[in-house]
Regions:
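Accessory carbohydrate-binding/adhesion or oligomerization-edge regions at the termini
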Residues: 18-69, 146-156, 176-183, 802, ...
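N-terminal carbohydrate-binding accessory modules
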Residues: 19-21, 37, 190-247, 268, ...
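Accessory beta-strand-rich segments of carbohydrate-active enzymes
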Residues: 24, 32-38, 61, 76-77, ...
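Beta-strand-rich binding/interaction modules
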Residues: 101, 113-115, 186, 190-195, ...
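Substrate-binding/catalytic cleft of secreted carbohydrate-active enzymes
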Residues: 244, 254-515
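Aromatic-rich peripheral "rim/lid" segments of glycoside hydrolase catalytic domains that contact
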Residues: 341, 500-565, 829-830
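Catalytic beta-strand/loop cores that center a nucleophilic Ser/Cys/Thr
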Residues: 398-405, 674-676, 692-793, 810-849
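Short alpha-beta junction capping motif
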Residues: 644-689, 776-778, 782, 802
Length: 850
């Protein structure tokens, strides 16, 4: 019998079956056998059954989970790696005599296809359908069709370690066949697809993308193939319609698929929605021309992606993978080869190749990056996003480092390139997990990691605070996301961003960085309407030097509009309000892009008390409005007088202890470095465990690893310092000068007035402000240098509010300890569990990126 072959069409795309095609649907129950030793033959008895489309996981086949201690990612209740057999009989009708017969496996792993026990084809493409010409083998009559799928071999080893087509961090390395499984008498033919207005005349001018005759801005997200119910990508159009609907609700118009390519259904839904897609090769690592196995595999995958999907209007951009390093000439060779196949696309070597240190190279139409070229440590002039790990940028980047403002942007970094710059994996601010989410995992994956994190918190005596930790860290994360996104929007020469992420990433140490959970459901942090206030085609932007003022100042700010909508705004008004004050600005220009709308000068003398206000901007004709918090404090206060009314010290000396025991009030601001963590303003980046490991490997400072504060705004300590339960911009001077204390050795129910939320690895009870009754006196401990913080109006106001509290009747600590007890608390080491090592595929070693 003539051996059949994998069909490779020399066309740029394939669509649904033609109307005159005959089709036999092969979905349903198949015979099944695991082949752990590689000894099963296609004709052997197979006593088990399985439902296809599906995987061994969704059918609960393979090895039942034995160890439930995994915290790096979600767990598979049933898993299998190796060869597995799927077999069934097929009946070819007489009317198919003389017809071609093709088998389509829309998405699977390396496979072998047998008809009546004879091998008739094999394939190892994982990004596109596998199609086999079985004409010679499937004549009219009854035949036995057997398919061996191997998720343990057949692709280069680097793909298992890196690609989101395989990784256990998200999609899992499943075995099975998903999507369409069918026999047909013809192959899909390329059809014309209606072009959504968003894609018309898409091109590049200078550093901007254009479509429809005007500049557009790519407001994107990173996608890592997170489908927690199935453990594999959705293959139906409706699921992808829902996916893109959520993206649109949150103002996004772009998705980057990190080291993988989505299926046909995604492109169909994106074509309908007007969402720009950037698929990638299934790779993250070193491009080594000498590794011909890897190079040939990646070239074949790219060619297959172009043949299969390039006709889709939504497929506009392509990259060779994630954070590649190695041979730039080889990367360029790949790009030019794919460009010849699909010249209407735009190409880049890799998302964040060489972590951005190599800058732009010939052949790159655009640059997805976190920086443009190298920089000295502590120099942020090349950066194109606001947050970094401590391993990758001094002090974790610009947002954590600089005094809060709405003026800083990435214009300097973007000016180092001449192509459009897209901010790579923007934000990555952690939120403490929501353990109510555990109940939602009813499918192929289970969050034993979340159960372990919950148990750790309970062991630390803080289980009752889990929801508050989630809400407080999430609200602060939301504001940090807003800042990072607006830094992009107020950069005139930036072309877009790709968030990491709108959705939680449940792997790589468990990175709860999403505004939505892993199911794309809300976490209750904000509505989509509130989010679109700063993430939409048209966004009004407050450009100011600070958020905090005294009442002797005038709030001076510029107003800009990121106008990437479809029409000119000339003559339209931008209304503003601040408390009871309001006004309007008339837009003076008909330009698109980032435009100057006008200036605000708002006197603040009316505010005689410390006040938190909302400054709101809204562009005429838009539903959304953008809101920033503003704080106004009295310029004159009685801080110096109040300092004389309490004992202020950095050390609890014998004399101070005696005065405390005899009834005086003591404010202790210790310089202690033992039993403390550092002061981190933003929530920790991505995942503490992973970047702790990377920082230590590279002799970098380890991030303090915290997730913001938790407090009670109604506590009398805040009578003169308006606050929410969470960190906000007015906390910057106090937090940056802080070193929160580990209160693990206090009673389980003891709570500090201002608590700092720790990460899921350590679970320390961290105190920024806490109090005790000692003898006849009262002790307030502030783990921050308030004299340093008082250099700013908000820091001075916090100091004032602390002292007003201490000199009021409300200062009445309930927890009683002795001086000796307090000394033991401050000096007794806290017993902490060991944090496991977790490395990343990108090594972050400077010598690897030069």
């Amino acid at each position: 019998m003539k051996k059949c072959f994998l069909v490779c069409l020399a066309v740029l795309g394939l669509v649904a079956c033609t109307p005159d095609e005959e089709r036999i649907d092969l979905s349903g129950v198949w015979q099944f056998a695991l082949d752990r030793e590689g000894l099963v033959k296609p004709g052997d008895a197979m006593s088990d059954t399985i439902v296809l489309p599906g995987t061994t996981d969704t059918n609960r086949k393979g090895d039942a989970i034995a160890w439930k201690g995994e915290t790096t990612h979600l767990s598979r209740p049933y898993s299998y790696k190796g060869r597995a057999w799927y077999r069934r009989t097929v009946t070819i009708p007489e009317k198919w005599a003389g017809e071609n017969v093709y088998l389509t496996l829309e998405r699977t792993k390396p496979s072998e296809v047998y008809v009546d026990g004879v091998l008739v084809g094999s394939a190892n493409n994982i990004s596109t359908p596998q199609r086999f010409d079985l004409t010679a083998a499937l004549t009219p009559g009854v035949h036995e069709l057997a398919i061996m799928v191997d998720n343990g071999s057949g692709v280069p080893w680097q793909v298992y370690d890196s690609s989101h087509a395989y990784t256990e961090n998200t999609q899992t390395n499943w075995n099975g066949i998903i999507g369409e499984i069918a026999l047909t008498t013809s192959l899909p033919e390329k059809e014309a697809i209606p072009v959504h207005p968003a894609f018309k005349d898409f091109h590049i001018e200078g550093q901007q993308f254009f479509a429809g005759g005007h500049p557009i801005y790519l407001r994107g997200r990173h996608d890592a193939c997170v489908w927690p119910l199935t453990g594999h990508v959705a293959m139906d159009v409706d699921s992808w319609r829902h996916y893109f609907k959520v993206c649109e609700e949150y103002g996004l118009n772009h998705v980057r698929f990190h080291s993988w390519c989505p299926p046909e259904a995604a492109f169909v839904a994106a074509d309908e929605s007007g969402i720009y897609l950037q698929p990638e090769l299934p790779f993250w690592g070193d491009v080594n021309p000498k590794d011909t196995v890897l190079m040939d595999f990646l070239m074949a995958e790219g060619e297959a992606i172009m043949r299969e999907y390039a006709h889709h209007p939504s497929f506009r951009m392509f990259a060779l993978g994630n954070e590649l390093r190695g041979s730039i000439p080889k990367m360029t060779e790949f790009i030019e080869h794919f460009r010849a196949m699909a010249p209407d696309k735009i190409y880049t070597l890799s998302s964040n190749y060489y972590l951005g240190y190599q800058g732009v190279k010939p052949g790159m139409d655009f640059f997805v990056t976190c920086r443009v070229g190298g920089e000295g440590w502590g120099n942020y002039g090349t950066h194109t996003r606001g947050s970094f790990s401590f391993a990758d940028a001094a002090d974790g980047g610009m947002i954590n480092h600089f005094y809060p403002n709405t003026r800083m942007n990435f214009e300097e970094g973007c000016s180092l390139a001449e192509v459009p710059i897209i901010s790579h994996e923007t934000a990555q601010f952690q939120t403490y997990p929501n353990y109510d989410e555990i109940a939602k995992y009813t499918g192929a994956l289970y969050p034993y990691n979340m159960e372990i994190f919950r148990d750790r918190l309970e062991k630390a005596g803080m289980a009752d605070q889990a929801k508050a930790f989630h809400q407080a860290s999430g609200q602060w994360s939301l504001r940090l996301y807003k800042q990072d996104i607006e830094m992009d929007l107020r950069t005139p020469n930036m072309a877009g961003f790709q968030l990491l992420d709108l959705q939680d990433y449940p792997g790589q140490g468990s990175a709860y960085v999403g505004i939505l959970d892993a199911f794309l459901d809300t976490k209750g942090l904000c509505t989509s309407e509130e989010w679109r206030g700063f993430c939409a085609p048209v966004v009004p932007l407050l450009i100011a030097d600070k958020f905090c003022y005294t009442n002797e100042e005038v709030l001076h700010a510029d107003v800009q509009i990121a106008n990437y909508g479809e029409e000119s705004l000339k003559g339209k008004t931008v209304t503003w309000s601040l408390g009871e004050k309001s006004g309007a600005i008339v837009v003076p220009t008909d330009e698109f892009g980032l435009i100057d709308a006008g200036v605000l000068d708002i006197p603040l003398a009316d505010y005689q008390q410390a006040t938190q206000l909302k400054l709101t901007l809204q562009v005429e004709g838009t539903k959304e409005f953008n809101t920033d918090d503003i704080w106004v404090y009295p310029a004159k206060n009685d801080l110096e007088r109040l300092k004389e009314m309490v004992v202020i010290t950095r050390t609890l000396t014998a004399d101070v202890a005696r005065r405390l025991e005899n009834g005086e009030s003591v404010l202790l601001m210790p310089d202690a470095s033992e039993q403390t963590v550092g002061g981190l303003f933003q929530t920790d980046y991505w995942n503490y465990r992973m970047f702790k490991t990377i920082s230590e490997n590279n002799n970098r400072h380890v991030s303090p690893g915290t997730l913001g504060i938790l407090t009670d705004p109604a506590h009398p300590l805040f009578a003169s310092f308006p606050t929410e339960m969470h960190t906000n911009w007015q906390w910057f001077p106090v937090v940056k000068a802080s070193h929160p204390f580990k209160l693990d050795n206090t009673a389980a129910d003891y709570r500090p007035i201002v608590q700092v939320i720790d990460n899921i690895e350590r679970n320390h009870k961290l105190g920024l402000v806490f109090e005790f009754a000692v003898g006849k006196g009262k002790l307030l401990v502030v783990m921050s240098d308030l004299d340093k913080a008082a250099e700013y109006p908000e820091g001075e106001q916090f100091y004032l509010s602390v002292l007003r509290y201490m000199t009021s009747q409300h200062f009445a600590p309930k927890t009683v300890i002795t001086v000796a007890d307090f000394h033991r608390l401050m000096t007794t080491p806290v017993v902490a569990g060991e944090i496991g090592k977790l490395n990343n595929i990108s090594p972050y070693k400077a010598e690897d990126y030069k």
